[in-house]
Amino acid sequence: MLTIADRTFDSHLIMGTGGATSMAMLEESLVASGTELTTVAMRRHAATTTGESVFDLLRRLDITPLPNTAGCRTARDAVITAKLAREALGTNWVKVEVIADEHTLLPDVVELIDACELLVAEGFVVLAYTSDDPVVARRLEDVGCAAVMPLGSPIGTGLGILNPHNIELICSRAGVPVLLDAGVGTASDAALAMELGCDGVLLASAVNRCQDPVAMARAMRYAVDAGRLARGAGRIPKREHAVASSTFDGLASWSDQVL
């Protein structure tokens, strides 16, 4: 079970909607993933949208929408966007993103911390997209974030987890859920995140931009479960030298042979 603030989810996989080629494909992928929580950029919300919107789809599938502040460059913009989301969708949950520049899409952690502190004071349940810096993650927890979401690598790159040591360090020190966010390229990346101690994984491009989104969504679902089970099972320690899995007792020797 994944518990964030006052909500509990069976699935540890959080999906994003960005990059989906069609509503039909998005629906199939979401169902295949088994997700119960899905992020949507607030700029995709429009009261005059014709046909079924992303929010209508999530409501029909009984998936909790998690509005995010994607595209915001300052704390002020993020706070305004979060308040608009609360008014439009009736939720105080928000994934806070404050991007430093359009080339790297890396978080501006100074603006991010300011935005999160302001939103927590306003009664929001804040999930913060951040760098893989353990000090920043601790600071976000200190200001009241309900979850920290360190990146594995830059958004959309599919490079996987570039600094597994930092991710594991964040997980070992956190008192709130740690959700790997950004950089996942394939199922093994998601499994590794869970093996490192993450409580969940958020991904979008890895599914929505691959050759077979439905198959990849299903793979991610199993990968997250496998990684979580492996973490709980406890891996064997890494060793410099080989250790035989079977003993040498009972092996025939030259002296045992009858000539």
Swiss-Prot record:
One example GO MF annotation: thiazole synthase activity
GO terms, biological process: thiamine diphosphate biosynthetic process
Keyword terms: Cytoplasm, Schiff base, Thiamine biosynthesis, Transferase
User: Can you tell me which residues bind 1-deoxy-D-xylulose 5-phosphate?
Assistant: G156, A182, G183, A204, S205
CDD domains xref list: ThiG (cd04728)
What is the protein's quaternary organization?
Homotetramer. Forms heterodimers with either ThiH or ThiS.
Give the protein name, as stated in the record.
Thiazole synthase
- The organism named in the record is Corynebacterium efficiens (strain DSM 44549 / YS-314 / AJ 12310 / JCM 11189 / NBRC 100395)
Q: Gene encoding it? A: thiG
